[in-house]
A protein has these predicted regions:
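Domain-wide signal for the mature, well-folded portions of proteins, strongly enriched
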Residues: 8-9, 13, 27-31, 70
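GHKL/Histidine-kinase-like ATPase module
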Residues: 29, 36-37, 44, 49-175
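GHKL (Bergerat-fold) ATPase N-terminal catalytic module, capturing the glycine-rich phosphate-binding loop
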Residues: 1-15, 21-22
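Generic, low-specificity signal for short hydrophobic/alpha-helical stretches with a mild N-terminal bias
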Residues: 16-17, 110
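Non-catalytic interaction modules of co-chaperones and other macromolecular assembly/maintenance factors
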Residues: 5, 24-30, 37
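A sensor for short, sequence-defined functional sites
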Residues: 179-180
Length: 181
């Protein structure tokens, strides 16, 4: 658990430089998102955000983060959570997803790459959605059912996390992954 002065700790201070940033006021919500994602991936770490002597502690596991960020209050009934983990020697991908049975039908998809929340998705999200649409369309066709590919996304709740050696992003803000594979 977090202690004020632990024997093994690292303190990082963020002070924006007006030579680099347009605004000297940091985006606290973005920092919160990054700390939440980092706390999931760095399982033994406790992360603390201290703003004007108000401390927020981040120590989440992947299921807790999924439930907190991917599910809405109206998602009281869901399918079983599916967890897929694929890893090669250096890179890895984990996808957690389920379907809401009674919440909004709009899909809710969150993702991160190397501890960085990727708000606008990218190739990894598109690939996952294409796989789901193809899977459901193929199964429906074999069963003799009519099925629109987008229906595979109705009620989808998903969190995708990647660890890549050379991620490529669409811009300086790193809000969309553009790697080809």
């Amino acid at each position: 658990s977090y202690k004020e002065n632990p024997p093994f700790s690292t303190k990082i201070q963020f002070k924006p430089d007006k030579k680099i940033f347009e605004s000297l006021i940091p985006d606290i919500d973005r920092l919160r998102k990054r700390l939440a994602v980092a706390s999931v991936e760095l399982k033994d770490a406790t992360l603390v955000l201290n703003v004007d002597d108000n401390k927020e502690i981040f120590r989440l596991d992947s299921i807790g983060y999924f439930n907190q960020e991917c599910l809405n209050d109206s998602d009281t009934e869901t399918t079983k959570l599916i967890d897929i983990f694929v890893e090669d020697s250096i890179e890895s991908m984990e996808v957690k997803f389920c379907y809401s049975l009674n919440g909004t039908i709009a899909p809710r998809i969150l993702s991160s790459v190397n501890l960085l929340p990727v708000d606008s998705g990218g190739t990894h999200v598109n690939m996952f959605l294409d796989i789901l649409k193809e899977l459901f369309t193929t199964k429906a066709k074999k069963a003799g059912l009519k099925f629109q590919p987008y229906d595979a996304l109705c009620g989808l709740r998903s969190y995708i996390t990647l660890k890549l050696t050379k991620p490529e992003f669409s811009g300086q803000t790193k809000d969309k992954l553009i790697n080809r594979k």
